[in-house]
């Protein structure tokens, strides 16, 4: 039986683990120091707690955590990389290419090898199949996940290409959600909300239909989207500082939406508005 190690048992990590176990893989992880909720998700997904010695026998290691935690995972795995012939690490986090290159350099210093990964799409389920894009040396080895029900796709570009794809796609998708949300809120504050929705129903019906799904789904995730917007800003900064400033502002926007979600405001108003 093929063993795959996964670090991260959030919504995506646990769903990926569930898909792998359903298709016949053994999935191991490190539960030491994890929250009670993370441990519960991991066990429900069929993940088994493992030592570094157990993980050394894995075919590969997947890191699926919030972008700010990606460097911590690399340091946590230092004992694994110090072992003879450690499995390759696929960093599948929403980090920009610059961050991925720094992480890969650190993994190499520790004695391991890192492949750049990027997940696009919702967590695996009966109705969803996200794509795992891969780039850099060793990507073909990680693409073997395909036989366990993961849609893994190798890109032609070097390490960082998968991260660039994720940054661009995420910037378009989550940037668009932010713009729509901001202007619906502005219309509500200024007495034009119902009229704006009526106009969208006539001239932008696909946008309105997407917004009815995406905006309610966004608020509980806003705290996680804030650091992703900062990664996109860092990606854009060297070549397009003006564009980078947009995504830094979007990071602040999502931080404010996260606070609004905690307070239980905004979303009820928007949900009522979007259902008219």
Language-model region placement:
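Rossmann-fold dinucleotide-binding core
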Residues: 4, 95-174
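Conserved beta-strand segments of alpha/beta enzyme cores
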Residues: 26, 46-48, 88, 113, ...
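Short, basic/aromatic-enriched C-terminal tail that caps enzymatic domains
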Residues: 264-276
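Helical "substrate-binding/catalytic lid" subdomain
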Residues: 165-266
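Rossmann-like NAD(P)-binding element
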Residues: 50-95
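NAD(P)+-binding Rossmann beta1-loop-alpha1 motif at the extreme N-terminus of oxidoreductases
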Residues: 1-56
